[in-house]
Amino acid sequence: MVAAASTYMIDGKQYVSIAVGWGGVFGLSQRVTELQSPGTVYTFAIDGKAQPPAFVKYQTEELLQGVKYDPKDVPEGTAIYVAACATCHGVPGVDKGGNVRNLGYVSAETIANLKDFVFKGPFRDQGMPDFTGKLRDEDVVKIQAFIQGTADAIRPKN
């Protein structure tokens, strides 16, 4: 539950509504189950018989690999990522992400083209900030280095 339940009556029938899912700040970058649970309001009728919908499993990519970067960019990329990205995207590859994808589990193509998402990108209508005027192209290159460098650092060695 992400909020208190509410109960009410309509035409003599009692209902209970509950907001559920991994919403709020925690749910942006974290999850505690392999099931996808977008923010939903469930309403139950007392003595109702309907079944809830089935949850689906999260679809994740493998741990990121293949993005070229200069290891010297990782330290500054870390600071920029923590300031601009970590609140929503979490630590790359350390967890599987929440309602917002963990960038350690996206395609190499996505990270290689990161500035297309950071500057006037396609997810602005879903809450992704536009970092135009706040970050520079060089900052994005350093963020890419941090993301791929972190994925490389945590990748299990065979």
Predicted regions and their residues:
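Conserved blade-ending motifs and adjacent loop-strand segments that build the rim/top face
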Residues: M1-G12, G23
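Gly/Gly-Pro-rich "capping" loops immediately C-terminal to redox-active cysteine motifs
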Residues: A5, G90-K120
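Entry beta-strands of beta-propeller and related beta-repeat scaffolds
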Residues: G12-I18
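Short, conserved, GDST-rich strand-edge loop motifs in beta-rich repeat architectures
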Residues: A19-L35
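Beta-propeller blade signature
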Residues: E34-D47
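Electrostatic cytochrome c docking/interface patches
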Residues: K57-I80
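Axial heme c-ligation environment in periplasmic c-type cytochrome domains
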Residues: V67, K96-G104, F119-N158
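Short pre-active-site segment immediately N-terminal to redox-active cysteine/selenocysteine motifs
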Residues: D73-E76, Y81-T87, P92, S107-T110, ...
